[in-house]
Amino acid sequence: DSTHGFCGAALSTNVIHFWKSDVGKWEWEKVIDVENEPHPDWPIPVPGVMSAILVSMDDKYLYLNNWLHGDMRQYDITDPHNPKLTGQIWMGGLLGRAPEVNGIKVAGGPQMFQLSLDGKRLYVTTSLFSTWDNQFYPEIRTQGGVMVMIDCDVENGGMNINENFIVDFGKEPNGPSRCHETRYPGGDCTSDIWL
């Protein structure tokens, strides 16, 4: 019954919160702003390129990616006007903060992601569009993409990469392959197959 919602702006790397006011007027505000980061090989600071956002089934957490920076973030949105950063992990990306995950070199950055219905498992893949992949992460052509699982703390907030799970699509038959969207048998947070 809530009128609150969120949308992500990819290139400016912002999250916009919108809601219907008590007088029935739609309002909006920018509630998350990811700063561009300097890079020695770029003439301008690198934007995060937030290609997706996701809200947990209990409306407690919002997840977002920064494909070029290389991080996934978790925000507590209990107060939708003031999201609080509660978790952040690094995997791949242009900033070089996590070039390897679980012993595998990551080509690309966190891109598509899917959350389990209980909110405890977030699966993240690294390919956006092949032309963009090839431009920003040319090594993905020969290495392929990966999928990692992030364990999410649904009580206190926080995220950790699961050290016992990684799918290396570079080793797939007829590969290397790229990975994009993930779906769960039985349902996930952005499909209605579980209804």
Question: What is each PLM-predicted segment?
Answer:
Residues S12, H69, P83, R141-V146:
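A detector of repeated loop/turn-to-beta-strand junctions in beta-rich toroidal repeat architectures
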Residues H17-K30, Q74-T86, Y137-E139, M149-N162:
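Short loop/turn segments immediately following beta-strands, especially the blade-tip
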